[in-house]
Regions:
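Long, non-transmembrane cytosolic or organellar matrix-exposed soluble domains/tails
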Residues: 92-189
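Soluble accessory domains appended to multi-pass membrane transport proteins
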Residues: 2-103, 108, 112
Length: 189
């Protein structure tokens, strides 16, 4: 483990099939001691980590950001082509879209305008690392609607702050969706 730099004290690891999810405290010939985030201690034989897979979060910790990848499911019945009036309203009421011009001969949909807005909004936030991937994509539609996958990296990697940042961003998106005459899909019987 140590010779191949697979594991170091201070690394955050998760081990599938065990309750280990925390910071490596100690590595010996017989055990790897992990302090879990609930403050319990897990001990795992080094052989387990060599013979099976585990996830080491060191790369994320040392990188420029922590990945956020979530989807918002839009109600398919609310997706439509934008009228000229809709586009003018978007430009007037949503400052990030003030200079938006569709490609020649293209009539954008309200879903497309929302995706454009999401990308512009994320790139305007200092908490988002725009040097890393930022991808907004429409995935295959499902019985739960049309998923808009939002993929970006938060500059802040501290768990509590990371959760707050992504929650605030997605709260904002949920609040903006009606401005695009869209609805989030909600299952009802």
């Amino acid at each position: 483990l140590s010779a191949n730099d697979m594991l170091r004290p201070g690394d955050w690891i998760t081990v599938p099939g065990s309750n280990a999810n925390g910071i490596v405290q100690e590595i010996t010939l017989n055990t790897v001691k992990i302090q879990n985030f609930d403050n319990t201690i897990s001990t795992i034989p080094p052989y387990t980590l060599v013979s099976a897979s585990f996830q080491n979060w060191r790369g994320m910790v040392e990188s420029g950001g922590r990945r956020v990848m979530k989807s918002i499911f839009l109600d398919l019945n609310t997706i439509k082509f934008c009228t000229p009036d809709m586009l003018n309203t978007f430009r007037k009421e949503i400052p990030l879209l003030a200079d938006y011009k569709p490609d020649e001969g293209v009539t954008p949909t309200n879903s497309q305008m929302f995706r454009v807005y999401v990308e512009k909004y994320l790139t305007s936030l200092p908490v988002v690392n725009t040097d890393l991937d930022l991808i907004i994509s429409q995935l295959q539609s499902t019985e739960y609607g049309v998923p808009i996958q939002i993929y970006f990296f938060s500059r802040n990697k501290i768990w509590k702050e990371y959760e707050r940042i992504q929650s605030d961003i997605f709260d904002h998106f949920f609040a903006m969706i009606p401005k695009f005459e869209l609805k989030v899909y909600q299952y009802s019987e």
